[in-house]
Amino acid sequence: MQIVVTGGLGFIGSHTVVELQNVGYEVIVIDNLSNSSIDVLGGIERITGKQPIFEQIDLREKAAVQAFFAKYTEVTGVIHFAASKAVGESVQNPLLYYENNIASLVYLLQELQKKPEAHFIFSSSCTVYGQAEMMPIAETT
């Protein structure tokens, strides 16, 4: 089974890739290297004994996302970690964040709709906004 990990060379993504490979999945990493390093591939290989397939793709480019799924037709799941998360930068440059966090998600989902058997896991931003009035935080807040 082919599993795609977007943002797969980032901290959380690379650890996820290691775990997936360790249990036998064929992992395809998509990363645009804007906040990661190609050197992480070597680290994954040292840990697991196998380097994942790597595609340097900017998910904001719809045609690139379409071409990826045309090339890899056996994908059965996507774990989506590719997103921007810096609050200050998002206020200074909101359009970049809309493109990276929303448009790229939409392009992925449009392609996955063509594969009803595929599963999708979305990892939301690690940044939490606001101050909690009460702890623990309830599901209803």
Give the label of every model feature segment:
Residues 1-141:
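N-terminal Rossmann-like NAD(P)+-binding domain of SDR-like oxidoreductases, especially those catalyzing
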